[in-house]
C-alpha cells in the first residue's frame, strides 16, 4: 500500500508488486486548511503500472465517484446511489480546470495556446481532485497539470476521466502515465474530457 504523507516502501521491493493501492487521505491540504470545501480522499488500484480502479470522495459535497478501467462507473451522493453524469451542460467555451493555489506559468501558457487556436476559454479554478471529478462528469473540458504533483494526486482521477470517455496524456512523451515508479512523481499531463477528446 502506498499512501501520501507516509514513508514509501523501498523501490526494489515495490517494483516486484503486481498490484499497488495508492491512497491520498487528504488531497487538497490548502483547501482543507482554508475550509473552502474542495478537498478529497483519493484511492487507486494499480496493476503493473496502470490504474485499474479509482475512487474520489469529494468530502464536503458528499459525493463519491468510482470507476474501473473497463468503463464501469458509479456515483454516490449523500449516501444514495445516483446515475453517473456523463455530459455537463453544453458550452461554447472551452472550460479549463486549473488549480486554485498552484497554477503554473506553463499552465497559463497552455491556456494562451488554446486561445491562439481560436477557442474562447473559461478558467475554472478548483482545488484538489475535484477538478478530475468535474472533468469526468463533463462539467469542465480540459485539466492541464504542469506543476509538481504525485501519483496519489492523479491515478484515481485518470481512471474516472477515461471511464467517462476522456483521455489522459503524459505531456512530456505523448504516451500514457505509469504508476508505482521509483520516485512517485507524476509527469506533466493533460486530462481531456469526453466533449473534446
Feature-to-residue mapping (PLM):
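Short secondary-structure boundary/capping segments
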Residues: 10-14, 56, 85-88, 180-182
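Oxyanion/phosphate-interacting regions
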Residues: 108-117, 124, 130-197
Amino acid at each position: 500500500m502506498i499512501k501520501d504523507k507516509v514513508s514509501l516502501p523501498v523501490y526494489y521491493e515495490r517494483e516486484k508488486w503486481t498490484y499497488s493501492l495508492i491512497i491520498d487521505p487528504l488531497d487538497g491540504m490548502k483547501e482543507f486548511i482554508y475550509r473552502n470545501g474542495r478537498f478529497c480522499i483519493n484511492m487507486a488500484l494499480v496493476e503493473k503500472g496502470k490504474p485499474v480502479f479509482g475512487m474520489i470522495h469529494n468530502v464536503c459535497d458528499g459525493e463519491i465517484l468510482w470507476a474501473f478501467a473497463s468503463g464501469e462507473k458509479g456515483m454516490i451522493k449523500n449516501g444514495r446511489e445516483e446515475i453517473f453524469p456523463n455530459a455537463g451542460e453544453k458550452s461554447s467555451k472551452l472550460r479549463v480546470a486549473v488549480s486554485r493555489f498552484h497554477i503554473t506559468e506553463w499552465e497559463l501558457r497552455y491556456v494562451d495556446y488554446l486561445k491562439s487556436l481560436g477557442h474562447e476559454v473559461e478558467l475554472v479554478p478548483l482545488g484538489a481532485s475535484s477538478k478530475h471529478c468535474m472533468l469526468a462528469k463533463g462539467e469542465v473540458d480540459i485539466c492541464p497539470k504542469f506543476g509538481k504533483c504525485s501519483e496519489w494526486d492523479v491515478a484515481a482521477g485518470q481512471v474516472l476521466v477515461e471511464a467517462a470517455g476522456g483521455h489522459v496524456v503524459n505531456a512530456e512523451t505523448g504516451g500514457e502515465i505509469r504508476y508505482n515508479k521509483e520516485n512517485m512523481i507524476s509527469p506533466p499531463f493533460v486530462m481531456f474530457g469526453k466533449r473534446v477528446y
